[in-house]
């Protein structure tokens, strides 16, 4: 049976993700144990709250090391919501910069919109040949966030002894207010979504099925 760990570091709607994966036949564990998180077929990194607080919580339980070690070994990782944001190099909240995991080049900033947070269902500009969004390219997904990454830059992952240069980088986008932001990111074993697939009905279930098929 396919196994997955939903990483439990104190931030995120973990129970809903555990249920969503279990309902798709995945043997799912909620834990922050390093060995279990490293050895599972898939790792989900959720996240809700402030970028800096999530990074602090992640580091307290060696979550950053788990992510680096899995990506280095080619083992799939899925970041969701702030779990996507922390994969970027930096986050800017309330005028303060915080360092992220750094596997995606760029920074996370406040959305430029009259109403924040961006909350509700929205469509996505799907990247060509997207694996995650295959079959649900024109569907709507559920978002709830105030910050996002507005661009993707080249990331120097060599400092982590990680080389993803042989893998295509696929970026899907969403627009809200005056911002066009990263809605989904795929690069080798690293996948991430700004929206919540576990709260996105049938389309979200199909996305999770697509990810599970890569494990």
From Swiss-Prot:
Pfam families: GATase. NCBIfam families: IMP_synth_hisH (TIGR01855). It comes from Bifidobacterium longum (strain NCC 2705). InterPro entries: Class_I_gatase-like (IPR029062), GATASE (IPR017926), Imidazole-glycPsynth_HisH (IPR010139). Its main location: cytoplasm. Residues 3-215 form the Glutamine amidotransferase type-1 domain. It comes from the Bacteria. Pathway: Amino-acid biosynthesis; L-histidine biosynthesis; L-histidine from 5-phospho-alpha-D-ribose 1-diphosphate: step 5/9. Heterodimer of HisH and HisF. This is Imidazole glycerol phosphate synthase subunit HisH. Its EC number is 4.3.2.10, 3.5.1.2. Gene3D superfamilies: 3.40.50.880. It catalyses: 5-[(5-phospho-1-deoxy-D-ribulos-1-ylimino)methylamino]-1-(5-phospho-beta-D-ribosyl)imidazole-4-carboxamide + L-glutamine = D-erythro-1-(imidazol-4-yl)glycerol 3-phosphate + 5-amino-1-(5-phospho-beta-D-ribosyl)imidazole-4-carboxamide + L-glutamate + H(+); L-glutamine + H2O = L-glutamate + NH4(+). Keywords: Amino-acid biosynthesis, Cytoplasm, Glutamine amidotransferase, Histidine biosynthesis, Hydrolase, Lyase. GO terms for biological process: L-histidine biosynthetic process. IGPS catalyzes the conversion of PRFAR and glutamine to IGP, AICAR and glutamate. The HisH subunit catalyzes the hydrolysis of glutamine to glutamate and ammonia as part of the synthesis of IGP and AICAR. The resulting ammonia molecule is channeled to the active site of HisF. SUPFAM superfamilies: Class I glutamine amidotransferase-like (SSF52317). It is found in: Cytoplasm. One of its GO terms (molecular function) is lyase activity. CDD domains: GATase1_IGP_Synthase (cd01748). The active site is at residues 81, 196, 198. GO terms for cellular component: cytoplasm.
């Amino acid at each position: 049976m396919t196994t997955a760990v939903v990483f439990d570091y104190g931030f995120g709607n973990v129970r809903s993700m555990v249920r969503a994966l279990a309902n798709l036949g995945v043997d799912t564990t909620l834990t922050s144990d390093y060995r279990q998180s490293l050895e599972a077929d898939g790792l989900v990194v959720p996240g809700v709250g402030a970028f800096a607080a999530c990074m602090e919580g992640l580091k307290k339980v060696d979550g950053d090391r788990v992510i680096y070690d899995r990506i280095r070994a080619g083992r799939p990782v899925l970041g969701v919501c702030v779990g996507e944001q922390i994969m970027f190099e930096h986050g800017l909240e309330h005028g303060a910069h915080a360092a992220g995991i750094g596997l995606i080049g760029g920074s996370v900033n406040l959305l430029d919109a009259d109403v924040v947070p961006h909350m509700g269902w929205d469509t996505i500009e799907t990247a060509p040949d997207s694996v995650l969004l295959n079959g649900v390219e024109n569907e709507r997904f559920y978002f709830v966030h105030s910050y996002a990454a507005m661009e993707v830059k080249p990331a120097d992952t060599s400092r982590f002894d990680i080389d993803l240069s042989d893998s295509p980088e696929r970026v899907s986008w969403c627009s809200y207010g005056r911002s066009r932001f990263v809605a989904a990111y795929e690069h080798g074993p690293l996948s991430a979504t700004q929206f919540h697939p576990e709260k996105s009905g049938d389309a979200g279930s199909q996305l999770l099925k697509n990810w599970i098929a890569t494990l």
